[in-house]
Structure formats: structure tokens, C-alpha cells
Amino acid sequence: MSEQTPNLKLTGKDLINIGIFSAIYFVLSFVGMFLAIIPVLWIIMPGIIAILSGIPFMLLCVKVQKPGVPLLMGLITGLLYYVTGQFTMVILATFVIGCVLSEIVRWRSKYGSFKWNTVAFILFSYGMTGSPLPIWLFKDSFFTQIADQGMPEAYVTTMESLSSIPMFVVMILTPIIGGLIGAYLARGIFKKHFKKAGMI
């Protein structure tokens, strides 16, 4: 008797779950973005958001072991950020790259592995690096822009002092550290759900 092929088509219930958990992710990431008022926290913000959002992302991966989760979550979150005026072309680029890579990892691992869903979450979390990334990408023009927008001189000066290569490395590492903490925190709190889904 041939093995039954699992149904990987998203149902109405799946889409509702994706919508709900995407909204929760947006709220948590939006709260994290307020950390940008403190320069050093803006640098590590992608990692902090990963810690905060590990539960909704990983629980959604448990509930919907099908393709489309990172892409749809990224699309919904991106639209919400666009509506609130918080979206830039850099964030758009990092979000798209992070979502696509996350989707590929889940697809290659057949959706049911905690380890690979954690990797997918880390890649997804790199989408938020688009917020502090202009500090290094555009540097002088970026600092001129935020000064023209009315940011205090002390804030701009502090940001300039943080725009070093070592701090860039720190920023790049934060989604990995935060993603691991967020994923294991989610599994620790909702162990029964992960065990039932075979993600232990």
C-alpha cells in the first residue's frame, strides 16, 4: 500500500491562524522598534524582536506545517508596516530576502523539524536588520537625514560613534542569538504543542 501524500494546501483555518499570528508578530516587532530611541538598542533591535516574537512564529510553524507561512507572515507584516509609515526600501529588501530563505529552509526540511524551523525563524528575523542597516549602508547621508528630521545632536553623535565595523558584526549576530532564545523559549513554554506536532 502506497504512503499517503500529506495535504500541503493551505485551508481557511490555516489562513486565519497565519493572519492572527502575523498580527501578534507585528505588534511585538512594533514594540521592539520603539527601542530605536536608545541608540545602542537600535543596533541590537533585530535580536530583541526575535526573542519577543519567537513564540508566535514557532507556534505558527507547529500549527501550519505547510508552505507559505514565512512568506504570508512577511507580506502581512510588511503591509502593516507600510500602512503605519515604518517601511523603507532597505527593510523591504531584507524582509523579502529573509522570508524567501526562511521559506526555502522549511520546504527543504518538510516543515516538521524543530531544528530547521528554528533556522527558518533566524533567517526570517534577518528581515528586521533593514531598520538599523542604513547606519552602515549610507552613513554620512543617513546621519544628515536624521539630523534634518530633528533628532537631537547628542543622539546623532552617539549613532555615529556606533557605526563601526565591530558594531555591524554585533548587529548581524543578534538575529542568530535572539532567534535561538526565542525558539527555545517558545518550545519550553508550549512543550505540549511541540511534542504533539513531533517537534521535540
For the regions a language model picked out, list residue spans one by one.
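Aromatic-anchored segments of alpha-helical transmembrane domains
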Residues: 22-30, 76-84, 123-133
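Membrane topogenic helices and adjacent juxtamembrane segments
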Residues: 1-33, 146-155, 162-170, 187, ...
